[in-house]
A protein has these predicted regions:
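Short acidic-aromatic low-complexity motifs
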Residues: 17-20, 58-60
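Sparse recognition of residues in long alpha-helices and their boundaries
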Residues: 38-39, 62, 160, 168
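Conserved GNAT-fold acetyl-CoA-binding loop/helix
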Residues: 30-52
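A generic secondary-structure signal
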Residues: 52-53, 119
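A short helix-loop-beta-strand connector motif used in the catalytic cores of GNAT acetyltransferases and
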Residues: 53-66
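Acyl-donor (CoA/ACP) binding surface of acyl/acetyltransferases
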Residues: 1-10, 14-18, 26-27, 72-175
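Short regulatory "switch" loops immediately downstream of catalytic or recognition motifs
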Residues: 66-72
């Protein structure tokens, strides 16, 4: 049985009440390089994205799940985990994780990743998950390598920044 409850966090569907926290994440300029964003998101755009989540992943080809944890006796949103570029024919999807700054380094990303892998394998019947990580994103490299993802390629000088070009490391995990 697939359980979206990890040992320290749980995953749930997006709700309209998640708009404010999503607005903060999606408009954090430091994260744009990771997400590929180049401009701010409006509340209207994010409201539409939340509404779109009511549709099946087979229609939208993506799914965002909210990561919740019990913090000081209260259920709090600590992050989100995405399945993206869902490809049911080849039974694979990309995966991405965001944890709010104040909740990082507590194991939430690793626990959420285990949950979404179980969901991907047990419900979506996926064969593999993949991700791409900038070479300077040490925390994400450690997360995916520690979860058994294997480096399967490098895109040299793939991400342009004001400081210069960064390579992107490709990881995949056969489920």
């Amino acid at each position: 049985m697939v359980n979206l409850q990890g040992s320290i966090c749980s995953l749930r569907a997006l709700e309209p009440s998640d708009l404010d926290v999503m607005y903060g994440w999606e408009n954090e300029v430091e994260l744009w390089r990771t997400s590929g964003a180049t401009a701010p998101f409006s509340r209207h755009q994010l409201t539409s994205l939340i509404a779109e989540q009511q549709y099946d992943i087979y229609a939208t080809r993506q799914l965002r799940l909210v990561i919740e944890a019990d913090i000081d006796g209260e259920h709090r949103v600590v992050g989100a985990i995405d399945l993206l570029d869902f490809d049911p024919q080849n039974r694979r999807a990309g995966v991405g994780v965001i944890i709010s700054a104040e909740y990082r380094r507590r194991g939430f990303a690793a626990d959420a990743l285990r949950c979404v892998e179980e969901y991907a394998r047990g419900v979506l019947m996926l064969h593999q998950l993949w991700c791409s990580v900038a070479e300077d994103n040490v925390a994400s490299i450690a997360l995916f390598a520690g979860a058994g993802y294997e480096q399967c390629g490098i895109r040299r000088e793939w991400i342009l920044t004001p400081q210069g070009a960064l390579s992107e490391i490709l990881f995949q995990k056969i489920l």
